[in-house]
């Protein structure tokens, strides 16, 4: 392709468990392979799955048949979606990204969400798939701001992540309108819709999708006046 002067890419590859003859490339190997001057800057993430649980955590609905994952993308990143972001993400400014899907077997901590907010300044949708509780329980940390976040989905996440985002002293979400969550998590974080620490964020929501049957108490409607 002699006329090609620009090639932007986002490549996600997986290696099956039964492919024992394949040698895995390291991050360093991948970076060296893109050193030629005609290539643009490239970022890469290489992960190894040691058991079915870890593999399931990383790739969610995909089969438990993989034992490694490699994500390579050109910089600047020109795509609107960033799929399967894990704790291996090293940061960087990806201004075009509007939607991020986070998943891992290890917990996402407060400081990592700070990296996410800085790396994706235009983020509008965040989906978190992580059943591990956070290890850092102190809430007197630096306030994190997601200035453009409109949609938050923590339905498949531990209750700690709902707390992380809904407590206004942890996260400032001035444009959040849509929340997807389990009823158990919502009732816990809001203390049955009486917690003042989550009231401000919840009061601005216009759409709440709740998994699980429930009879909303009177305080529910007062807590979500825009529903």
Question: Each PLM stretch: what is its role?
Answer:
Residues 1-227:
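Eukaryote-biased activation of long, low-complexity terminal tails and linkers
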């Amino acid at each position: 392709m002699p006329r090609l002067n620009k090639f932007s890419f986002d490549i996600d590859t997986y290696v099956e468990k039964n492919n024992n003859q394949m040698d895995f490339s390291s991050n360093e190997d991948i970076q060296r392979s893109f050193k030629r001057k005609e290539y643009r800057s490239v970022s890469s993430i290489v992960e190894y799955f040691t058991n079915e649980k870890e593999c399931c955590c990383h790739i969610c609905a995909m089969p438990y048949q993989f034992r490694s994952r490699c994500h390579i993308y050109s910089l600047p990143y020109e795509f609107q979606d960033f799929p399967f972001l894990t704790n291996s993400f090293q940061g960087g400014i990806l201004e075009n990204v509007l939607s991020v899907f986070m998943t891992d077997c290890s917990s996402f901590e407060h400081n990592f969400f700070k990296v996410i907010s800085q790396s994706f300044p235009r983020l509008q949708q965040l989906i978190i798939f992580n059943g591990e509780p956070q290890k850092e329980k102190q809430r007197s940390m630096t306030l994190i701001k997601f200035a453009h976040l409109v949609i938050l989905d923590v339905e498949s996440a531990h209750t700690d992540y709902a707390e992380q985002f809904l407590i206004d002293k942890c996260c400032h979400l001035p444009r959040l309108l849509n929340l997807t969550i389990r009823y158990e998590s919502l009732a816990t974080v809001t203390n049955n819709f009486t917690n003042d620490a989550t009231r401000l964020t919840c009061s601005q929501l216009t759409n709440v999708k709740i998994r699980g049957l429930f009879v909303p108490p009177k305080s529910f409607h007062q807590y979500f006046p825009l529903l």
